């Protein structure tokens, strides 16, 4: 009897532990998966400004390359791949929010023409699903299905991101046409330097807010520094707070100027944007082109046969 009660108690404890762990995973997982898109989604109605600049560059200040590969042309109602490449040195480590070093994450925003959208799961081939992996894409806005975002995701695994895209059918969507369309992409690796509210992250350089002498440097218990700058003529003191992460470049007694860097710049990531073009091809135009090419080939064949027949007639007349 006692053994049965003990086993029952152990079973309840295990069930409770699993439930708590699952809740923590869901909460933290949701936060991580929404961290990159929510920054832009909360602050901007459209991720691409009128100047062509993608708004992610407002927080990720360093300029880095990004690449995109799409088919030259696609037929209506067809699933195709848009491959975004975010290259960087896999050996690099970035400063995390707690000041420690860790691996870089990546994220991307893909701005498609109106009518193009994320392909439904039942339209994606097994080969394409294998390329996509465990990535979960989402629309920038419920009404903007042509703008897709992803991230942050581990950069070492997803420096190349495959988006499954469904092309529109002008026969069903009257506002789409058989034309050449632009596609815009933005991709970042690593954390940003500025938060959406304008405040600095710990992944950037910190400058002196006043000129004077560094009279005191206090190392905080949780990391970072408090630097006291004393203005010699007036004796006014200014305290600059440095979060954990950046390395200190100044020492006590040193004379510094306004806006002089107090720390190194720990940022190893950056943001880049690019574009590509894709043609929504009319199937009738393709069929017409094939018919034209076939007719040209047949005409050439008949011309050769006619020429040989004429040569035979000439040869027979000469022999006669």
UniProtKB/Swiss-Prot annotation:
Cofactor note text: Binds 1 heme group covalently.
Extent of the signal sequence: 1-35
Molecular function terms from GO: electron transfer activity; heme binding; iron ion binding
Name of encoding gene: petA
SUPFAM superfamilies named among the record's database cross-references: Cytochrome f subunit of the cytochrome b6f complex, transmembrane anchor, Cytochrome f, large domain, Rudiment single hybrid motif
Co-factor(s): heme
Complex and partners: The 4 large subunits of the cytochrome b6-f complex are cytochrome b6, subunit IV (17 kDa polypeptide, petD), cytochrome f and the Rieske protein, while the 4 small subunits are PetG, PetL, PetM and PetN. The complex functions as a dimer.
GO cellular component: chloroplast thylakoid membrane
Protein name: Cytochrome f
Lineage: Eukaryota, Viridiplantae, Streptophyta, Embryophyta, Tracheophyta
């Amino acid at each position: 009897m006692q053994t049965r009660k003990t086993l029952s108690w152990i079973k309840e404890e295990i069930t409770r532990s699993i439930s708590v762990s699952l809740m923590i995973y869901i909460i933290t997982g949701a936060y991580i998966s929404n961290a990159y898109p929510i920054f832009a989604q909360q602050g901007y109605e459209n991720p691409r400004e009128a100047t062509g600049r993608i708004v992610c560059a407002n927080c990720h200040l360093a300029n880095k390359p990004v690449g995109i590969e799409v088919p030259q042309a696609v037929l209506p109602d067809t699933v195709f791949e848009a491959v975004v490449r975010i290259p960087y040195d896999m050996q690099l480590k970035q400063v995390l929010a707690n000041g420690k070093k860790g691996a870089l994450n990546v994220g991307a925003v893909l701005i498609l023409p109106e009518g193009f959208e994320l392909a439904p799961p039942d339209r994606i081939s097994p080969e394409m699903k294998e390329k996509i992996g465990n990535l979960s894409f989402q629309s920038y806005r419920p009404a903007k299905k042509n703008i897709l975002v992803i991230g942050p995701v581990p950069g070492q695994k997803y420096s190349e991101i495959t988006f499954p895209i469904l092309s529109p059918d002008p026969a069903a969507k009257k506002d789409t046409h058989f034309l050449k369309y632009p596609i815009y992409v933005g991709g970042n690796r690593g954390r940003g330097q500025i938060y959406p509210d304008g405040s600095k992250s710990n992944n950037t350089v910190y400058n002196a807010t006043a000129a004077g002498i560094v009279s005191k440097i206090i190392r905080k218990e949780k990391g970072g520094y408090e630097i006291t700058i004393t203005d010699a003529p007036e004796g006014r003191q200014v305290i600059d707070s440095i979060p954990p992460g950046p390395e200190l470049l100044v020492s006590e007694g040193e004379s510094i100027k306004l806006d002089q860097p107090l720390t190194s710049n720990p940022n190893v990531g950056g943001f880049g944007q690019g574009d590509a073009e894709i043609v929504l091809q009319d199937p009738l135009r393709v069929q017409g082109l094939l018919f034209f090419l076939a007719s040209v080939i047949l005409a050439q064949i008949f011309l050769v046969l006619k020429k040989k027949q004429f040569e035979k007639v000439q040869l027979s007349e000469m022999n006669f």
